Regions:
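Structured beta-strand-rich core segments of catalytic domains in phosphoester-bond hydrolases
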Residues: 1, 5, 19, 23-98, ...
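Active-site beta-strand/loop signature of hydrolases that rely on acidic residues for catalysis
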Residues: 8-31, 89, 100-104, 120-146, ...
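Active site of divalent-metal-dependent phosphoester/diester hydrolases
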Residues: 30-31, 44-63, 80-83, 128, ...
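Surface-exposed cleft-lining segments at the edges of enzyme active sites
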Residues: 73-77, 103-111
Length: 204
């Protein structure tokens, strides 16, 4: 049995994270305006991007932040089947420092994901400030450029922790720029969706 939106809000309130990245959210009347409801109840800044707009649904990604959002963009990734994309959100974290948050959802097809991952890597290479890349990669044993990405789970020996109950692999990731230190990583076995939530503490 899936939780209600109120269950998810309660969980997120308890975690009290500075940033929250969600995938497969639906900002439509029939879904209870999930994005707006979460924004109001959590009292956070938000950035939403719909990858799919059809049949009364606005279906995509949302990033919430306790810090004011400096800039934002929604970027479509190359997709042959269902449209996939990523949100790029820039927040100011103090002392003139910026942080890039990239929230993404990759495709189900292996060849399609290879192209999408390369697009994300090429995008990240252009960034001048620290970055966090999070989301549903739909792939275990992810092959990525280790010169520009550090896997938060691997950094604290949690790489065998599953994030999706129906898979034997970890398919959700938090990747950070090399200079970011991973202090904590956990996957609470909470029934918040078909994926488990990931919680991490970073030193930037």
């Amino acid at each position: 049995m899936f939780p209600t939106l109120f269950d998810i809000i309660d969980f997120l309130r308890i975690e009290n994270a500075d940033f929250i990245c969600l995938q497969e959210v639906n900002e439509s009347a029939k879904a209870g305006f999930q994005v707006s409801s979460l924004k109001e109840d959590l009292n956070m800044y938000s950035h939403f991007g719909a990858n799919v707009v059809a049949l009364g649904s606005n279906y995509g990604l949302v990033t919430y932040s306790k810090y004011k959002i400096k800039s934002q963009e929604h970027i479509y990734l190359s997709s042959e089947k269902e449209q996939r994309g990523m949100l790029h959100t820039v927040v100011k974290i103090g002392f003139g420092r910026n942080l890039n948050i990239i929230n993404l959802h990759l495709g189900l097809d292996k060849d399609e994901r290879k192209v999408q991952i390369k697009e994300v890597e090429n995008f990240v290479k252009k960034l001048k400030d620290p970055y966090i890349v999070v989301g549903d990669f739909n792939q275990g044993n992810l092959d990525f450029n280790k010169e520009i990405f550090k896997d938060a789970a691997v950094s604290v020996n949690k790489n065998n922790t599953l994030t999706f109950g129906a898979s034997l692999d970890r398919i959700d990731y938090i990747l950070v720029s090399p200079e970011i230190e991973v202090k904590y990583y956990d996957v609470p076995m909470k029934n918040m969706s078909d994926h488990y939530p990931i919680v991490t503490k970073l030193k930037i």
